[in-house]
Amino acid sequence: VENLTYEMFYHLVTEFPHTNTNPSQNRPAQQFELAVRYLENNYTYNCTIEDLCVSLSLSRSYIYNLFQKFAHTSPQKLLTQMRMEDAKSKLTSSNQSIQEIADLVGYHDTFTFSKAFKRYSGYSPSTYRKHFS
């Protein structure tokens, strides 16, 4: 299940860099694209924003500025959104335990996952599964 916000990020990543022909002005857009791709490829692991910064050799403040400029959100919020949308999908389409789903979306502590999921969706994972399966 993809929501409208995730689709917006996908659109930004796939379309925005092609709208500017000046390579020096494209650099931040390309860095943003790389950052989003990194999160898409690694959100299922216990990756952090620090891991993203190290991977791209960029400072934390620069990464946050990129996300504010191109996505009007923080990288942490996008990372959480990716994890929670995947968790919502898994909760409604599989019989995997909440612990297994937490592990699959990058949380290795079920309590932390459950708190984050409730904050994101308004439901505990088990309640969400019951209501939306």
Q: What positions do the PLM features span?
A:
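Key DNA-contact positions within bacterial/archaeal DNA-binding proteins
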Residues: 61, 111, 126
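Short, Lys/Arg-enriched, Trp-marked, Pro/Gly-tolerant hinge/linker segments that flank
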Residues: 1-2, 6-41, 45, 50-56, ...
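Core residues of bacterial helix-turn-helix
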Residues: 55-56, 105-106, 117
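Terminal helix-turn-helix DNA-binding modules in bacterial transcription factors
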Residues: 36-37, 41, 46, 50, ...
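Short, highly charged
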Residues: 64
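Feature detects amphipathic, helix-rich regulatory segments
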Residues: 123, 127-129
